[in-house]
Swiss-Prot record:
Biological processes annotated in GO: antibiotic biosynthetic process
Needed co-factor(s): FAD
UniProt family annotation: Belongs to the acyl-CoA dehydrogenase family.
UniProt name for this protein: Amino sugar nitrososynthase RubN8
Gene name as annotated: rubN8
Species name: Streptomyces rubradiris
Pfam families according to UniProt: Acyl-CoA_dh_1, Acyl-CoA_dh_M, Acyl-CoA_dh_N
Source species, domain of life: Bacteria
Keywords recorded for this protein, A-Z: Antibiotic biosynthesis, FAD, Flavoprotein, Monooxygenase, Oxidoreductase
InterPro entries reported for this sequence: Acyl-CoA_Oxase/DH_mid-dom (IPR006091), Acyl-CoA_Oxase/DH_mid-dom_sf (IPR046373), AcylCo_DH-like_C (IPR036250), AcylCo_DH/oxidase_C (IPR009075), AcylCoA_DH/ox_N (IPR013786), AcylCoA_DH/ox_N_sf (IPR037069), AcylCoA_DH/oxidase_NM_dom_sf (IPR009100)
UniProt-listed PANTHER family: ACYL-COA DEHYDROGENASE, ACYL-COA DEHYDROGENASE YDBM-RELATED
Source species taxonomy: Bacteria, Bacillati, Actinomycetota, Actinomycetes, Kitasatosporales
SUPFAM superfamilies in the record: Acyl-CoA dehydrogenase C-terminal domain-like (SSF47203), Acyl-CoA dehydrogenase NM domain-like (SSF56645)
Top enzyme class: oxidoreductase
Length: 423
């Protein structure tokens, strides 16, 4: 993503401990005010699957929800994904569900900023309007990507220049408070081509409904619900073009990497929180820790270092390549996505291993549902299901890159070509 800031090296490099820009430091300072409340509410919100709406109202008041909006539009101007990841890491140490929901808002600020800078005039106008509303704390924008069951979310012309949207999305994070949704949808075109669009739909649009009742294994307080669309009217100016199904264009990978790579910080934060709980528990015990427990603690320290270094390298890579619009678009997309996917595989594996070992160190008390390590053990597993890519799709992508195999790497397009019972 574009930036005029002069970043300085993190101290120590690759540690994901500090921000590298002044706006990033400002964001961390603001978040520090909210961390005690987030930490205190994590357990009851997880138990009851309650979204922390009051916390997000506080975020709106303090400007946190506009952190990734450019300063020219009233936002904080955090543009380095490294700094976004550090912020999410801090929040995830207190509560991963809150961090996941906040990521959805941060990601939208980043991607809409790109549309504002590089999109056609109608798109720039739409992006500016939404970004200014985000900066004021008035717009909370969720992403609705995954179709529910066998349904396919589709657009069709309304006969007067606009569109009608129908379908149902699942796993829509931050749905309880979202004012808008960016929806992945398909529309037929001449010649049998199927086009991909991202209509932006306001919550109060006729035909839109929030479907409550989701009970997840982890991230239970993230407000992850279903959203249904029944002939929702969408003005032509509220539509973002996203290519076509089966185009095999890797240029789309750049935007997908930019919008998702900072999420690595969430799972580093979960692993760090588990480590801290385990070490604090051992320190309170009067007996000298047994050799087996000390071995697990030592391995946890090494894994945490690897986690932070791996995630940091992927973030730096995306930050450096994001403004390189002089490159071949497909090559740029692959060079941003491939290190991200290598890091995602390792972060997901190592973070889960850290949490599992911390359960072993602390012992049987962690088997109680209310123990904080029990919550962390469920939350950390969400990473394997996040796009791009899920673990299975990530294996397909990385192995195809290594072996030179042809495939459609745009997961939105690829999903549209799969049989409905395998999505």
């Amino acid at each position: 993503m574009e930036t005029e800031q002069a970043p300085r090296p993190a101290e120590p490099p690759g540690d994901l401990t500090t921000a590298i820009t002044a706006p990033g430091e400002q964001l961390l300072t603001l978040l520090d005010r909210h961390l005690p409340r987030i930490r205190a509410q994590a357990a009851p919100n997880d138990r009851d699957s309650t979204f922390p709406a009051a916390t997000f109202h506080g975020f709106a008041r303090d400007g946190v929800l506009g952190a990734t909006v450019p300063a020219e539009l009233g936002g904080m101007g955090v543009s380095r994904l490294h700094d976004v990841a550090v912020a999410l890491l801090r929040v995830a140490e207190a509560d991963a569900s809150t961090a996941l929901a906040l990521h959805a808002q941060f990601s939208r600020g980043i991607t809409l900023t790109y549309e504002w800078l590089h999109g056609p005039p109608p798109t720039r106008k739409l992006a500016e309007r939404l970004l200014r509303a985000m900066a004021r704390g008035e717009a909370v924008i969720g992403g609705a990507v995954k179709d529910h069951g066998r349904e396919t979310t589709r657009l069709r012309p309304d006969g007067s220049g606009g569109w009608l949207l129908s379908g149902r999305k699942t796993l829509v994070t931050m749905a309880p408070i979202a004012t808008h949704f960016v929806v992945s949808a398909q529309a037929p075109a001449a010649g049998g081509t199927t086009l991909l669009y991202a209509p932006i739909v306001a919550r109060d649009t006729p035909g839109l409904s929030i479907v409550d009742g989701w009970t997840g294994l982890g991230m239970r307080a993230s407000g992850t619900l279903d959203v249904a669309f029944d002939d929702c009217p969408v003005p032509a100016g509220n539509l973002l073009a996203r290519g076509s199904v089966g185009a095999h264009s890797d240029a789309a990978l750049a935007g997908q990497a930019v919008s998702s790579v900072a999420m690595l910080g969430i799972y580093v934060g979960v692993a760090q929180a588990a480590r801290d709980l385990a070490v604090e528990t051992m320190a309170r015990r009067s007996a000298t820790p047994p050799a087996a427990s000390r071995t697990l603690v030592a391995e946890t320290e090494a894994r945490l270092y690897a986690l932070r270094a791996t995630a940091s390298a992927a973030l730096v890579n995306v930050d450096e390549l994001s403004p390189r619009h002089d490159m071949d678009p497909d090559e740029r997309g692959r060079r941003m996505m491939t290190p991200f996917q290598c890091a995602k595989v390792m972060v997901n594996q190592l973070a889960a291993a850290v949490v599992d070992d911390c359960l072993t160190v602390v012992g049987g008390a962690t088997y109680a549902a209310e123990h904080p390590l029990a919550r962390l053990s469920r939350d950390v597993r969400a990473g394997r299901f996040m796009q791009p890519y899920t673990y299975a799709d990530g294996v397909d992508y990385l192995s195809a890159q290594a072996l030179g195999l042809e495939r459609d790497n745009n997961y939105v397009s690829l999903r549209a070509t799969r049989p409905v019972d395998s999505r």
